[in-house]
From Swiss-Prot:
It comes from Suregada multiflora (False lime). InterPro entries: Ribosome-inact_prot_sf (IPR036041), Ribosome_inactivat_prot_sub1 (IPR016138). This is Antiviral protein GAP-31. It catalyses: Endohydrolysis of the N-glycosidic bond at one specific adenosine on the 28S rRNA. Residues 29-55 are annotated as: Disordered. The keyword Hydrolase applies. Belongs to the ribosome-inactivating protein family. Type 1 RIP subfamily. One of its GO terms (biological process) is defense response to virus.
Length: 55
């Protein structure tokens, strides 16, 4: 399966955002010869502003 990193803007704080960025940085780090790109899904109250990126 793909690695996933999630972040919700609802109830978000500076700390939760920093933790999200750190997790994203760790999971996108290249391992050996392969580069892993996690699934990234943005959750929001408006379904029109959600997105999924998978590599």
């Amino acid at each position: 399966g793909l690695d996933t990193v999630s972040f919700s803007t609802k109830g978000a704080t500076y700390i939760t955002y920093v933790n999200f960025l750190n997790e994203l940085r760790v999971k996108t780090k290249p391992e050996g010869n392969s580069h892993g790109i996690p699934s990234l899904r943005k959750s929001s109250d408006d379904p029109g502003s959600s997105f999924v990126v998978a590599g």
